[in-house]
Amino acid sequence: FGEDEESQALKKAWEDHGGAEYKIIDRGGYKIGLFGVMGEDSVYYTAAGSNTFPDRIEVAKKMVQKLKEEGAQVIVCLSHSGTNKDSSKSEDEILAQKVDGIDVIISGHTHTVLTEPIHKNKTWIVSAGCFGKYLGLLDIDAKTKEKIDYQLIPITAESPVDQTISAKIQEYKTDVNENYLKQYGYTMDQSIGYTNFPLTDVYEDYSAFTGNSMADLITDAYVYASKLTTKDTSFTIGLTAKGIIRSGLVKGDITVGEVYDAVNLGKGNDGLLGYPLIRVYMKGSDLIKVAELDRSVGKDMMVDGQLFFSGMQYHYSDYRFILNHVVDAEVRTNAGFYIPVEKDKLYPVVTNLYIANMLPSVGKKTF
């Protein structure tokens, strides 16, 4: 933990809620050791402030040794590292290969649905996707560590309710309502809007390089909020990225909790949850560079980096070289039609602070 005020508050919360480097639980007559690690890729995307993360391989080796010394018979690693189709880039496979003694790695971060576990260096690597869509079940022999059964059980409206988990969820909701939302006059289940059609969750086809109705709503909302605040009636471009959109909306009432689910990352200097919005002016030539990053990086290299625009569109050719795919870009006027971007003209752009912090790197690109 860092020494600044926020980091120390995080440390206190960690301690108050029973946080620990590792834990041993007794189940079925066996001692099961648990520990967690943070992956390199997830650290890269984390707004960690002054907090630092030690090398996960060294941490894992240390934890395995401690757990064995304290009598753990099965060792489970909760990993926010993830897997990759390319095993040389698959962090949890690398972890299993480099650290002996881990029996199971429950893999997170990449939201991978592993229909069959990966077996590497006597370690079972499992992953049940994201957002509670599946319940993962791995049954192994506690003595031989051989796999007996593995299932991904879909969580649907017909799934039986676990009363213990349901009570815990209600406890958390009451805590959020009383200690956070109440000061703004809201509750988690309060309806604040309605949609007569579903807004698509980007995770329905995360690798697809295509438009998204939820992203359209978010970027349009950015523009609307900007105009309310600045009283500027000129056309404005809204910009966000796939990686910070966390869910869609189903048809019907829109609740406070659902809005938070969709845009729940970050925090502003005022202490409010969510990345604050920022309004900047960008030259047309830089807008074209942003479009190029979207096409070359968001489509071909980093799925999380796909960008979504309100008030701007561009045309590209797949037959051109990387970082040179974009043919032209256009912005939408208040009259609703599109006109070509002028390279030397300044255009108002509203985005969130996370995206804004990445924009300076655009000017360093050469293409």
What are these language model-derived features?
Residues 1-158:
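Acidic, metal/ion-coordinating pockets
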